[in-house]
Amino acid sequence: MAQSPPPAVVTVTGAAGSIGYASLFRIAAGEMLGPDTPIRLRLLEIPSAVSAAEGTAMELDDSAFPLLRDIEVHDDPKRGFDGTDVALLIGSRPRSKGMERGDLLAANGQIFTVQGRALNQVAADGVRVLVVGNPANTNALVAANNAPDIPAERFTALTRLDHNRAIAQLARHSGAAVKDIRRVAIWGNHSSTQYPDIFHARVGDRSGAEFAADREWLTGDFIPTVANRGSAIIEARGASSAASAANAAIDHVHDWVLGTPDDDWTSVALPSTGAYGVPEGLVSSFPVRSVDGSWQIVDGLEIDDFSRKLIDASVGELESERDAVRGMGFI
């Protein structure tokens, strides 16, 4: 009988929140790391939310997942991240009414400085980190800069939700099935400045460029619908995307660990290598493939003037966020 692999330690911050709740049961069921990998869950919360996280842990116990070896609940990052193989950093300070952008960056800069340092001290050698909490790109930048012993490319931010949204919108417009759409790309920030790119996509046996040629639809419908989808969901349901964000986080880690299909790629925000003119070190979204457990930016894509302008605008926003947190001493 084949021996099962050693258990993977998975830490989820903001575990009592709605995205955490929507993620944890699917992780415990094996949807993120595959059907053969046992899971040890670490739920990390702020002290005031520990009781709620303990309630979630009780529900996880009651689900009797065969892969779930144990669950711990912590409010101390050093204990919550001890030996972690995969860290989903979902918890962050949300923007409250009247809050200035600088205040938001400062509040989250403190959170992700602490978490980056704790990961640096106690996480497993091969730790993979996914930042979901917004502003995700810059929070990932702060965490990575405070974890100098962990390779920077192990810190990523979630743009798979935007990627999935783009696939869904292109499927709706083209009449194709979601499964037949490949090679969509998200560039830049996980914000309304992001650029969902279909010029290199495949829609069944058709080129995404065919659909991009309809500039009225592209600029008046597709791009703004994808870029502003989060706001539209808040407006409609009175709460932010939770299940779809959890789904995207699971997709992201699944593909990171288990690989992307040979004929497709996905979108991930990760520290730039200088590719496509994005300043080195800036955490920006790119089209990527997962090869042997590591992300590789897809190279050689032709970027026309239309795309270049949109990529540069989003990168400019990321540079201003980076400069702000640098000025605050977080990086």
Curated annotation (Swiss-Prot):
MF terms in GO: L-malate dehydrogenase (NAD+) activity
Pfam families reported for this sequence: Ldh_1_C, Ldh_1_N
Record-annotated disulphide pairs: none
CDD domains found in the cross-reference section: MDH_chloroplast-like
Class of enzymatic activity (EC top level): oxidoreductase
Reactions performed catalytically: (S)-malate + NAD(+) = oxaloacetate + NADH + H(+)
Residues where substrate binds: 95, 101, 134, 165
Main function: Catalyzes the reversible oxidation of malate to oxaloacetate.
Family, per entry: Belongs to the LDH/MDH superfamily. MDH type 2 family.
Protein name (Swiss-Prot/TrEMBL): Malate dehydrogenase
Name of encoding gene: mdh
